[in-house]
């Protein structure tokens, strides 16, 4: 099962990088300065990063699910705040939100499959 999940998690990571690029570009358009120092990301992030401590695929999936759910809440907040006020940022937030919901669904599906496999063993 790990061989099926790893490419999907890599795809998620690529999409997260794309999200960061979209947000950095928008910050620049608004004449702000994106955070480029990873240490600052940890300080300012609404969702905290937790480095994996267990290599078991179930643990990794659960940890990723927590992160995706936090991201969903944050992008929903941004979409709500910018609705009717900043159409460009609102559009970016809702596009990212859709991706995050898709990631959440992928992770839930994998966790469900993993649970079914365990029950059959």
Feature locations, PLM:
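Iron-associated oxidoreductase/ferritin-like identity signal
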Residues: 1-121
